[in-house]
Design a protein with these regions (language model features):
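Short amphipathic helix-loop junctions that connect adjacent transmembrane helices
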Residues: 33-48, 234-250
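Primarily marks hydrophobic transmembrane alpha-helices of the MFS/SLC 12-helix fold
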Residues: 78-81, 85, 282
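Helix-loop-helix hairpin linking two adjacent transmembrane segments in secondary transporters
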Residues: 103, 141-192
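Intracellular juxtamembrane helix-capping segments at the cytosolic ends
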Residues: 117-132, 318-331
Length: 390
């Protein structure tokens, strides 16, 4: 481990570089949400047209995670991030100029592809920093992502409240994110060693799951956790309003509680793992989320339901960062191909989960539909218990 002054400076710079990548990615993503109704109006779309355009983003996101492996092999995670974030910023700046369904869908696809590609690459970089300096930073860096997402959304909301035009605010905001982050992205470490061929360790202790089995379990963990997160963000306000009877203003508190809990636990996640071990943190976190969701479905009151969503966020917050960490270290070299698989499983959950809840709610009730995240947390808990510290 680097202990000299020079080594400590290198570690700090590498961590700042990776953190800047996560922050830029999240702020650009956060800028999008509040402006979507305006983008819809600018393009002259109805609700179904907007749904088609946003499907382009989802398809692009999954495509990006799948093409990440060859891209990182060819250019390295550092250059994928440094080149991808400015191009992603240009994509956001062009959104107000999209003149119809076809152009908007294509643009959303491109932005989604870059978002998925950069997501995998910057997580590879975070794994490289952990391995090189023997410091656990993955969970805290994901905590920064959560905070930056909120900042980006708040910045967009402030622009809307001030009556600024989307043609001015979105391009300028995206440009600021790109320019400011560029000053720190140059500190991204070279993670070329993370692109070597994967080598399974034949001398693992007996009883330890094989890397392939661990990878499958991590995909289940990511699928379940992302699925719950997607449902919490997109459906919790509707659940509190229709199933609990909250007024429209209070219904949004569920998303706030969930997001705050997730960010807080991510900043604590690395310390908790250092003290208790990753399997314990994963298992206790997912189990706590399961109990909280079960209580929310039983108790039909606002305050306990909001508190339950906060506990769900607290429990699941570190789970995905830790899954990415293990995926990056399942193979001796931290080979890139492990992370795209886990990321693809996760994003699939975030897309399928909300759709599944809507479908079941139409057939039965929203309360019954919320059995979906309950089952997902149970699956995540069981899968997390079978993993080991990398």
């Amino acid at each position: 481990m680097a202990t000299t002054g020079e080594g400590q400076r290198a570690m700090r710079r590498a961590r700042v570089g990776v953190t800047a990548a996560f922050a830029a990615h999240a702020m650009l993503s956060g800028l999008l949400g509040p402006w979507i109704p305006h983008i819809k109006d600018q393009a002259g779309l109805d609700a179904s047209g907007l749904g088609i355009a946003l499907t382009g983003f989802a398809v692009g996101l999954l495509t990006g995670t799948r093409v990440a492996d060859p891209a990182i092999r060819r250019w390295g995670g550092r250059w994928v991030v440094r080149g991808g974030i400015p191009v992603m910023g240009v994509g956001f700046a062009l959104l107000p100029a999209a003149g119809g369904l076809a152009s908007l869908t294509l643009l959303f696809f491109g932005i989604g592809l870059l978002a998925g590609l950069i997501d995998v690459a910057m997580n590879i970089e975070a794994v490289a920093v952990e391995r090189r300096f023997e410091r656990r930073v993955m969970s805290a860096i994901h905590g920064t992502w959560s905070v930056a997402l909120f900042v980006g959304a708040a910045l967009a909301s402030a622009g809307i409240a001030a009556g600024l035009s989307i043609r001015i605010h979105l391009p300028i905001s995206a440009a600021l994110v790109v320019v400011v982050s560029a000053a720190f992205l140059r500190w991204l470490p070279s993670a070329g060693e993370a692109t070597e061929a994967p080598v399974e360790r034949p001398d693992e202790p007996r009883g330890r799951p094989s890397p392939t089995r661990v990878l499958l379990l991590l995909c289940l963990v990511a699928l379940g956790s992302f699925l719950v997160e997607g449902i919490a963000v997109e459906w919790s306000a509707v659940f509190l309003r229709e199933s609990v009877g909250a007024d429209p203003g209070a219904a949004g508190l569920g998303v706030v509680a969930f997001s705050a809990g997730m960010a807080a636990s991510r900043f604590l996640g690395d310390r908790l793992v250092a003290r208790f071990g990753q399997p314990v943190v994963d298992r206790v976190g997912a189990s706590s989320a399961f109990v909280a969701l079960a209580a929310m479905l039983i108790v039909h009151r606002l305050v306990p339901s909001v508190a339950a969503l906060g506990i769900v966020g607290l429990g699941l917050g570190p789970v995905v960062p830790l899954a990415f960490r293990t995926a990056g270290r399942t193979f001796r070299t931290g080979h890139a191909s492990a992370l795209p698989l886990v990321a693809t499983a996760g994003y699939t959950g975030s897309i399928v989960g909300p759709l599944l809840v809507g479908f079941i709610a139409d057939l039965a009730t929203l309360r019954i539909a919320f059995l979906v995240p309950l089952v997902a947390t149970a699956v995540s808990s069981l899968a997390a218990g079978a993993t080991r510290d990398p």
